[in-house]
Amino acid sequence: TAISEMGYENPTPVQEAVIPVLLHNPSFPNTLIPTANDSEDTSEEASVMSEEASAISAEGADITEAAEESNEVIAEITADADSATEVSAESQRHRDIIALAQTGTGKTAAYGLPVLQNINPKDRTTQVVILSPTRELCLQIADDLKDYSRYIDGLHVVAVYGGTSIEGQIRQLKKGCQIIVATPGRLIDLMHRKVAQLHSVRNIVLDEADEMLNMGFTDSIDEILAALPEERQTLLFSATMGPEIERIAKSYLKDYQEIVVGS
């Protein structure tokens, strides 16, 4: 598939389902996907992100595709979206996404690669927030995103979580970063200290949302979502669709599309 040509020799079902949908999503104003009107245009950002896309493999292998081929790869992703997923062209226009997928299905790449394409690396304000239930997952996501974006000059990812000194995290945030990966409690603390500034956030990802709710982060999640700009995209990943997930979807997601991966 075209996703395989991005460097994923064995893309997982959640990657095949989510990546094409996000790349088609019109709420990504800066998505670097060729269209009938601009297919001949290339931008510096497209070149950088295309090189990055070809560098990633499911096994963490080195670059397997030449950078000059990657614009063609992105175009093929666009063309192959219908065959790569069961999502219709109409449903691809939905703004927000709920993806029901188990842990260990490659979710970070599924949302990480498309989200990275929407970031302006010249702007040091926070543009993406990713919430995770544990310190370990928070660090894993941050490490993966740093790996994916290693060819994007000026892009900074900061992980913030409890159980360690907050001072170092405050210093990192004050330097500016485009992506914050956080546990809900620590992010709330940094918001109250007016260190985490979320007024420019365009994408919010809730990874393992059901686990965060089970751990008692309901109020924190509500406060974080309520503090974000109205114009944003929300991506919610969960293993189950329980009552609290449905409540969050009804309260904070707009015209969302539900993707179910696996049984």
Predicted region positions:
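Walker A/P-loop NTP-binding motif
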Residues: 19-28, 108-123, 143-149
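Post-DEXD/H (motif II) to motif III coupling segment of the RecA-like Helicase ATP-binding lobe
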Residues: 197-206, 210-262
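Conserved nucleic-acid-binding Ia/Ib motif block in the N-terminal RecA-like helicase ATPase lobe
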Residues: 124-192, 200-203, 246-250, 258-261
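Residue-level signature of catalytic and energy-coupling elements of molecular machines
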Residues: 3, 15, 99, 115, ...
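Acidic, glycine-centered low-complexity repeats within long intrinsically disordered regions
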Residues: 48, 52-59, 65, 72, ...
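Conserved pre-motif I regulatory segment
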Residues: 1-41, 80-98
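Methionine-biased hydrophobic packing positions in alpha-helices, especially
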Residues: 103-105, 115, 191, 212-215, ...
